[in-house]
Amino acid sequence: MPQGQLFFKTKNTSKQWVDAYTEYGMSLEDGAIGEIITPAPMKEGVSNSLATADGVAYMAGTIGKKNERTLSFNIHILAATEAAGWTAYRKFCREVLDPQYVQMKIVDGTEPFPTYLNNGVETAGALHLLFRSCQQVGRYRMRLLKWTLTFAEPNPSVRDNREPSIMN
């Protein structure tokens, strides 16, 4: 994934979008985009299954709601030297993972993901994620670092660029 395709924004990046490739030498591994663009699961609606009636009755307004989802995908950092690999890794952890709350977006060709409807117009948005864990997959003399990141997306219906409310 070359420059201009994967972006992060956190309080440690001065709330500005940062190009992952330019800043950290980071790219998504094969299969990562498929994991990221997979639709969120739906919540089970509130229902009542009475023995005296056929079928199941669902309470109005309780169906069609998205559930929290977990995203796990592989990334890698490619650096010119071992020292540059360590520097990029530490900078990524400090700027993107340490704040825990992360916004992420992808631009694949000219198509942004995610998008949302803004007054009927499809508009580029952002995934609002909470960092959960990082599992090291492998390294080659610190020039090529590969690992798996896991995030929670608490509310997949929020895809606009505003700051979501987080409970205190």
Question: Regions from the language model: what does each represent?
Answer:
Residues 1-168:
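Extracellular/virion structural assembly segments
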